[in-house]
């Protein structure tokens, strides 16, 4: 089982987009049974909240459902459980380092920051970045 975890600030935009896009990709590739995919936040700000409505709309416009998601914060058990943990930007990396000093599992989702659409308002660009990163991850892991 390949275990993938996506991390962003609040777990209501970028990391759930990563989670549900990759779930959709592995399902379409017929390999969903080989993957466990989830997403979390580094902060506690949005705990329990669903996917942010503009992010949900962007995903739905591409046929990707994200129903049932509720934001949660990363835990030590997540770090222990997941083999591949991807953060969306350098701020997330700093939070992760503070929460789990010296942990070596954390990797950048892309070689550049994925801008937070909560601030930019550009959910389409975030969608494109997420798809790019998920395609690369899927290629590397399958």
Language model features with spans:
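Conserved active-site segments centered on acidic
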Residues: 1-78, 139-142
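Cofactor-cradling patches in redox/metallo enzymes
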Residues: 81
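Phosphate-binding/catalytic loops
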Residues: 84, 88-142
């Amino acid at each position: 089982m390949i275990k993938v975890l996506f991390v962003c600030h609040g777990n209501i935009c970028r990391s759930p987009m990563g989670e549900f896009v990759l779930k959709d990709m592995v399902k379409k590739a017929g390999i969903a049974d080989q993957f466990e995919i989830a997403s979390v936040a580094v902060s506690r700000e949005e705990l329990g909240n669903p996917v942010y409505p503009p992010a949900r709309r962007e995903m739905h416009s591409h046929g990707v459902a994200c129903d049932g998601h509720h934001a949660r914060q990363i835990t030590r058990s997540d770090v222990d459980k997941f083999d591949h943990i991807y953060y969306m930007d350098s701020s997330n990396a700093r939070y992760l380092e503070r929460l789990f000093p010296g942990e070596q599992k954390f990797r950048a989702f892309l070689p550049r920051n994925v801008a937070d659409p909560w601030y930019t308002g550009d959910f389409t660009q975030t969608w494109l970045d997420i798809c790019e990163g998920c395609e690369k991850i899927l290629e590397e892991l399958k």
